[in-house]
C-alpha cells in the first residue's frame, strides 16, 4: 500500500468523524496549522520518524504543531495515528484532509501575489469576482513579491491570471 492510499483513507475517516461531530471547520484549521508547521520546520518529519523518540513525545510534538487551540477530535486522531504506527504519514494526511474538505465545501485556494499589501477591500472584491466567475467559494491567500513591477498575479488552482 502506498503513501497516497493510506493518507486518503485516514483523511476520509477524519473528515467523516469531524463532519459527524460538526467540527470539520475546526479540524480543517488544525490541519492547515499542522501543514504550515511541516513547511516551517523541516526537522518535524525527522522527529516523527526517529525511533528513539517515544510515541507520547511524538504525540505532544504533533499537538504543539497544530497550535494552541487544537480540537479534541484532532487530538484523538493524532493519538490514533500514532497507535496505528502511521505517524510518518501525518503530513500527507493533513494535506489530504484539506483537499477533501475543500472539495466538500466547493472551495478553491487562490493565491493573490502583489508587490505591496493590497487593501482588504480590494482583496475582498477580487475574491468576490473569482467566486462569481468560477462558481466556487474562495480561500484567498496573499503573498508579497517586491519583484513584481505592478499589478498582481492570481493563481486559482492550476490557472494563472497576470493582471
Predicted feature locations:
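Elongated, mostly alpha-helical coiled-coil "stalk/stator" tethers of large membrane protein machines
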Residues: 1-163
Amino acid at each position: 500500500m502506498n503513501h497516497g492510499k493510506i493518507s486518503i483513507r485516514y483523511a476520509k475517516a477524519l473528515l467523516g468523524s469531524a463532519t459527524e461531530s460538526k467540527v470539520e471547520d475546526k479540524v480543517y484549521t488544525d490541519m492547515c496549522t499542522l501543514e504550515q508547521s511541516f513547511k516551517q520546520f523541516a526537522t518535524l518529519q525527522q522527529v516523527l520518524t526517529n525511533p528513539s523518540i517515544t510515541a507520547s513525545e511524538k504525540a505532544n510534538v504533533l499537538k504543539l504543531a497544530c497550535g494552541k487551540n487544537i480540537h479534541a477530535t484532532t487530538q484523538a486522531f493524532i493519538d490514533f495515528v500514532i497507535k496505528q504506527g502511521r505517524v510518518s504519514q501525518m503530513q500527507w494526511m493533513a494535506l489530504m484532509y484539506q483537499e477533501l474538505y475543500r472539495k466538500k465545501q466547493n472551495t478553491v485556494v487562490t493565491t493573490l501575489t502583489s508587490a505591496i499589501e493590497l487593501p482588504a477591500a480590494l482583496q475582498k472584491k477580487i475574491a468576490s469576482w473569482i467566486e462569481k466567475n468560477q462558481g466556487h467559494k474562495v480561500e484567498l491567500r496573499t503573498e508579497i513579491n517586491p519583484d513584481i513591477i505592478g499589478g498582481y498575479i492570481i493563481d486559482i488552482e492550476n490557472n494563472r491570471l497576470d493582471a
